[in-house]
Structure formats: structure tokens, C-alpha cells
């Protein structure tokens, strides 16, 4: 379908029901990293943790690899991981309702979004809905995860006590 000039709109059930991953990789996971960063009290830990959180957010955004973020949530609090899973599921529903049909090969990051969405044209993929819905999804997930991290007192990166941090480093 990608090479066929007669294709006016992609209708692959795989692409239709798999395009929600783009919301998650491009918007939800960077929002989660920002929430983790902003939940760290101001001080040296916040500055020291910035590089880690920025790099895993950037990795999720560009390549779609989200395991470092997911594991940080899972180990900090399983409830944060459940919230991520629910957010992920909602992303699929929104993408299917908007009839977004962006294919992917591996991960649904920015590279694949451009190759299989933007470069194929909005008429074929409805890629614009990823951006239109992605911004409110980013905002909602940022506030949701910041609230959950603070209410659960989750020990996300940078929020652990000095004793816990030293113990981790000594092992």
C-alpha cells in the first residue's frame, strides 16, 4: 500500500488498531518523565536526575523504546505502572476512533511516525490526529502522574532518601 499511488487511504486493521502506540511513545511517556522530574524536590537530586530522565524521555520520543520508564514506574509503585497501562489502552481507543492508520515496524517513535505517517500524507494515514490529541494527552498524563507520584509518595528516580540512594550505590 505504501508504494501504490492508487491507494487513497490505508485500511489495515493492524495499523488501525496499533496506532495508539504513537500517542503513548510521543506524548505519554515524555509527560511521565516530566512529572517524575517535577516531583523531585528542588535541590541537587533534581539536577542530578535530570540527565537520566531527559535521556529516557528522548529515547521514548525518538525511537519508541519505553522500557526504562516503564520499569522505573513499576519498581517505584505498581499502581503507577497500572496507571500507565490504562493510559496506554485509552490511547488505542482514541486512535481507533480517529481512524489513524499509521504503520510501524518496531516501536512507534518519531522516526516511524514520520516515515509511516507524515511522509505518506494525512489523507492516507490521518496522522494529524496524533498531534491534535497528543497535546491534551500529554497535559492530562503529566498532571495525573505528578499527582499519583506525590500522593503515593512513590520513590521514583530522585525521590528516594539519601540512605536508600547510598545503599543502591554500594551494592
Specify the residue positions occupied by each region the protein language model found.
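Structural signature of hydrophobic alpha-helical transmembrane segments
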Residues: 18-26
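A short, structure-level motif marking secondary-structure boundaries and short turns
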Residues: 18, 41-42
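Generic hydrophobic alpha-helical membrane-segment signal
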Residues: 23, 52-58
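Membrane-proximal intracellular helices of multi-pass ion channels
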Residues: 36, 42-52
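Transmembrane alpha-helical segments and their short flanking loops
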Residues: 1-16, 29-34, 38, 55-56, ...
